[in-house]
Amino acid sequence: MIKCAEDFGIDWVTVMSDPWAEASAFGIQVEYPEDTLPVDTGGHLPDATAASVMEHYNPLKNSRCLNRLKEIEIFRKQAGDRFFIVGWVEGPVAEYVDLRKATNASVDFLMEPDIVEKAMDTIVECAMSFIHLQIKAGAHCIGIGDSFCSQIGPDLYFRFAFERQKKLVELIHSENVMAKLHICGNTESILEGMIKTGVDIIDIDHMVPSMDRFAASLASHQVFSGKSDPITVIQNGERSTIIQSVRSDFIAAKGRCIVSAGCEITPETTIENMKNFKSSVFELQKL
């Protein structure tokens, strides 16, 4: 990660992606094939009631969580203050989905919401402990990944996620570091809520049509991050396409935007296009 940041002029280093770390600490069995996505293979909770009474995990006794803490310590030791160090936790909705699987979780949200909320409170309490340890290890910022929120609509977002995300953000701020919120997919219907959590950096997925009408809602300490399409623009686009995408997003955000992909950049992206993405930043100076 440090080498990548050095080669391509990236301003931060991050412990993502390992979104299954906390799930494995809760007991989910996860396999990590070489050069592809992790696969959850067992250990899922049988029902919402089981989720609501699950025990808190100890990050210091789980290998994936310990790896994250060690990564941050290495970043701090080797990169010092050259790069912005971003730690990570899963948000309540995403983590619940990991524990129950997507279809089961979706039914739970509709049929047993009160029981689901008990489980999510446990998830948040565990995340708070993990956040504290990551900050102690040297993180400048903690990202919160709550990907499935884009699939549940505004009503359920505000019931399950908003206050809990806000609680995590407030904890992060109380320890004098920044907070970042990432929700995959088209978050247009919940974007005002994401902003109101008070988080410092709001990731914008490429599926969000535009940041234009939301820019005025940002507080003075807030910025967007995004949202060039990882496939059609960054992986497959010509240099001019990449520059135009970055320019359009920057203008739409009224200049309140970190230049970033609108979700994860693919392994198939060429070095040339990564360099084009980097150079697109300097084109903004011409605006």
Question: Across the structure, where does each feature detected by a protein language model lie?
Answer:
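Glycine-rich, N-terminal phosphate-binding loop and its surrounding beta-alpha-beta segment
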Residues: 1-27
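Active-site loop segments of alpha/beta catalytic cores
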Residues: 4, 11, 36-37, 57-287
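A contiguous, low-structure linker/loop signature
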Residues: 19-60, 81-82
